[in-house]
Swiss-Prot record:
Pfam families: Flu_PB2_1st (PF20947), Flu_PB2_2nd (PF20948), Flu_PB2_3rd (PF20949), Flu_PB2_4th (PF20950), Flu_PB2_5th (PF00604), Flu_PB2_6th (PF20951), Flu_PB2_7th (PF20952)
InterPro entries: Flu_PB2_2nd, Flu_PB2_6th, Flu_PB2_C, Flu_PB2_CAP-bd, Flu_PB2_middle, Flu_PB2_N, INV_PB2, PB2_helical
General function of this protein: Plays an essential role in transcription initiation and cap-stealing mechanism, in which cellular capped pre-mRNAs are used to generate primers for viral transcription. Recognizes and binds the 7-methylguanosine-containing cap of the target pre-RNA which is subsequently cleaved after 10-13 nucleotides by the viral protein PA. Plays a role in the initiation of the viral genome replication and modulates the activity of the ribonucleoprotein (RNP) complex.
Subunit architecture: Influenza RNA polymerase is composed of three subunits: PB1, PB2 and PA. Interacts (via N-terminus) with PB1 (via C-terminus). Interacts with nucleoprotein NP (via N-terminus). Interacts (via N-terminus) with host MAVS (via N-terminus); this interaction inhibits host innate immune response.
One Gene Ontology term, aspect cellular component: host cell mitochondrion
Organism listed in the record: Influenza A virus (strain A/Chile/1/1983 H1N1)
Gene: PB2
Protein name according to UniProt: Polymerase basic protein 2
Length: 759
């Protein structure tokens, strides 16, 4: 107060005012501050001061020929003075106005193409809806967010090559466009920009916006996809928020969302297969998201999510060094620990082998709806400061932190046995056992934890075991804060290793991720996800498994047919028949398999009994380990549509229906493809035509290798011999003729010879 009075006093004297307004600023420190370095220290002042001058702008000399010296009001537009230090002329801001109104007009056709991201933003805002403003405390946490909607996901280097190729195609310099996306974009942009008059530099800037993901570390409460971030300044302040629904979606957000769903589905499916890592890789390589290969997206997309990171680790890509536990991302901010195995007893006297972390450590915990700071020592929680959107989110964070602390009172709070299993029916590790147990019910844990009186600290409040807030007492070490905890900003990526059970470890051997950490929520993907791998057939239920299995057999019929006659065991073991087994009632799987295999063997032994439709229909049943029994079946049951449906061994049924006239197969009424050969007519006519130019030598001879399909015969050299599989499922030995002249007679003799060779 005293100082303010003093200042008022001074200001009332006219001399003070004069000194402050009229004297020159000649203090060396001040002069230094404003003149050292190239960086403008007070840009807005500088701008105002410059614009107050008569000619603050410089322009190319040619402007004087294109603009009159005075405008209609008689104001001077440019000075005859040259700009000091360059050969440009000084012009007035009025010249810009004149140019905008009366200057030459170029074609505007390229504007929407070049300024695509801006035009699209305007459309999104036009169609967006802004709701009411709510005043409330905003828990914002800094997250790394994507700030330019509508971009492709090229790396800076890839984008640079594309931009150089599009904007400066004739410049020298090595540019290798390798990825699919690079080539497509380059071609597209070159076509769009023919005869474009916009300055190349501007085009380059705008292309960069379109091609590269730009991220910033910003305080956010609410949606983090780029269409929300572009209106961040309109939707949330320090104490208010405005509801907003974007007026359109952008592909980059859709890619991120669909990638997460695909990765979760793949990790969940791989975890239950015999070799999780191999399965995961096979699925990543055979999946497409919105028409782009998933592996290409994984290489370029920086999304950090547990399942996505497991897929990246499997591909040998670097991922973030933070680790995941209970759905929270933990980042150690200080301290260190060593691991030691210790046996502990639960409240139910069950022994658990824990890997105990010894030492003082501090972590930030960031989840979707809550964040926290955790300080812990060996098996002891020292302090936990939580903030979250609602009570439920805060509870989740507290449970995870308490389990992570490995405190004895937490282990003693276990009631009942711990026997949680993962999707593959394997027991979870002790830490996840404890986590699952307390996630189901944390009451005993909170009651046993203990409470303490608390000091009054600004912005912090206590929380009692029943989750009511309090200013006097709180659960030991636990406080709730109004302020969120920022996500870890460092985007460093580290080399990791992954074992066959999909556990991801850093170089020190700490587990960063495992399938247990993958979120179970199911969402609907924005872009079409195409899983080509048979392992994913079951994602859309039993019907899809049935249809896909038969489609696969029909698509690969040529090779399946050869394997069926030459190497059936290998065929029965194909992974494509694995999903089908879950449809066959467990008790009878083995008998069905034994029956079908015997039937197939008879077909191989007794000539002329080869029946394509029947083989296709029954083949998936032969994949189960067979049980020998004398049982015969006239129909086989599959569990679809919630009940058992029958497939008739001979003849059609609603499940499996082959139409002889159209040669189309329908499975459960869905089209499963067309057979390229007619199974019943026998194909002697076709074969005799195809076998023109070949001499049939007799029965199959194993020395000449496995049987080829008729289509593969064309690769033989003249005089070369080979076994060939003909339509009835029989194998004969042929030789390609040395001369073409005798081809005509072949088709007549072929039919006779086939009969002789077989009989």
């Amino acid at each position: 107060m005293e100082r303010i009075k003093e200042l008022r006093n001074l200001m009332s004297q006219s001399r003070t005012r004069e000194i402050l307004t009229k004297t020159t600023v000649d203090h060396m420190a001040i002069i230094k501050k404003y003149t050292s370095g190239r960086q403008e220290k007070n840009p807005s002042l500088r701008m105002k001061w410059m614009m107050a001058m008569k000619y603050p702008i410089t322009a190319d000399k040619r402007i004087t020929e294109m603009i009159p010296e005075r405008n209609e009001q008689g104001q001077t537009l440019w000075s005859k003075m040259n700009d000091a230090g360059s050969d440009r002329v000084m012009i007035s801001p009025l010249a810009v106005t004149w140019w905008n109104r009366n200057g030459p007009v170029a074609s505007t056709v390229h504007y929407p193409k070049i300024y695509k991201t801006y035009f699209e933003k305007v459309e999104r805002l036009k169609h967006g809806t802004f709701g009411p403003v709510h005043f409330r405390n905003q828990v914002k946490i800094r997250r790394r967010v994507d700030i330019n909607p509508g971009h492709a996901d090229l790396s800076a280097k890839e984008a640079q090559d594309v931009i150089m190729e599009v904007v400066f195609p004739n410049e020298v310099g090595a540019r290798i466009l390798t990825s699919e996306s690079q080539l497509t974009i380059t071609k597209e942009k070159k076509e769009e920009l023919q005869n474009c008059k916009i300055s190349p530099l501007m085009v380059a800037y705008m292309l960069e916006r379109e091609l590269v993901r730009k991220t910033r570390f910003l305080p956010v409460a609410g949606g983090t996809s780029s269409v929300y971030i572009e209106v961040l300044h309109l939707t949330q302040g320090t104490c208010w928020e405005q509801m907003y629904t974007p007026g359109g979606e952008v592909r980059n957000d859709d890619v991120d969302q669909s990638l997460i769903i695909a990765a979760r589905n793949i990790v969940r499916r791989a975890a239950v297969s015999a070799d999780p890592l191999a399965s995961l890789l096979e699925m990543c390589h055979s999946t497409q998201i919105g028409g782009t290969r998933m592996v290409d997206i994984l290489r370029q997309n920086p999304t950090e999510e547990q399942a996505v990171d497991i897929c990246k680790a499997a591909m040998g890509l670097r991922i973030s060094s933070s680790f995941s536990f209970g759905g929270f991302t933990f980042k150690r901010t200080s301290g260190s620990s060593v691991k030691r195995e210790e046996e502990v007893l639960t409240g139910n006297l069950q022994t658990l082998k824990l890997k105990v972390h010894e030492g003082f450590e501090e972590f930030t915990m960031v989840g979707k709806r809550a964040t926290a700071i955790l300080r812990k020592a060996t098996r002891r929680l020292i302090q936990l400061i939580v903030s979250g959107r609602d009570e439920q989110s805060i509870v989740e964070a507290i449970v995870v932190a308490m389990v992570f602390s490995q405190e004895d009172c937490m282990i003693k709070a276990v009631r009942g046995d711990l026997n949680f299993v993962n999707r593959a029916n394997q027991r979870l590790n002790p830490m996840h056992q404890l986590l699952r147990h307390f996630q189901k019910d944390a009451k005993v844990l909170f009651q046993n934890w203990g409470i303490e009186p608390i000091d009054n600290v600004m912005g912090m409040i206590g929380i009692l075991p029943d989750m009511t807030p309090s200013t006097e007492m709180s659960m030991r070490g636990v406080r709730v804060s109004k302020m969120g905890v920022d996500e870890y900003s460092n985007a460093e990526r580290v080399v990791v290793s992954i074992d066959r059970f999909l556990r991801v470890r850093d170089q020190r051997g700490n587990v960063l991720l495992s399938p247990e950490e993958v979120n179970e929520t199911q969402g609907t993907e924005k872009l079409t996800i195409t899983y080509s791998s048979s392992m994913m057939w079951e994602i859309n239920g039993p019907e899809s498994v049935l249809v896909n299995t038969y489609q696969w057999i029909i698509r690969n019929w040529e090779t399946v047919k050869i394997q069926w006659s030459q190497n059936p065991t290998m065929l029965y073991n194909k992974m494509e028949f694995e999903p089908f087994q879950s449809l066959v009632p467990k008790a009878i799987r083995g008998q069905y398999s034994g029956f079908v295999r015997t039937l197939f063997q008879q077909m191989r032994d007794v000539l002329g009994t080869f029946d394509t439709t029947q083989i296709i229909k029954l083949l998936p049943f032969a994949a189960a380990p067979p049980k020998q029994s004398r049982m015969q079946f006239s129909s086989l049951t599959v569990n679809v549509r919630g009940s058992g449906m029958r497939i008739l061994v001979r003849g059609n049924s609603p499940v499996f229906n082959y139409n002889k006239t159209t040669k189309r197969l329908t499975v459960l009424g869905k089209d499963a493809g067309t057979l390229t050969e007619d199974p019943d007519e026998g194909t002697a006519g076709v074969e005799s035509a195809v076998l023109r130019g070949f001499l049939i030598l007799g029965k199959e001879d194993r020395r000449y290798g496995p049987a080829l399909s008729i289509n593969e015969l064309s690769n033989l050299a003249k005089g070369e011999k080979a076994n060939v599989l003909i339509g009835q499922g029989d194998v004969v030995l042929v030789m390609k003729r040395k001369r073409d002249s005798s081809i005509l007679t072949d088709s007549q003799t072929a039919t006779k010879r086939i009969r002789m060779a077989i009989n």
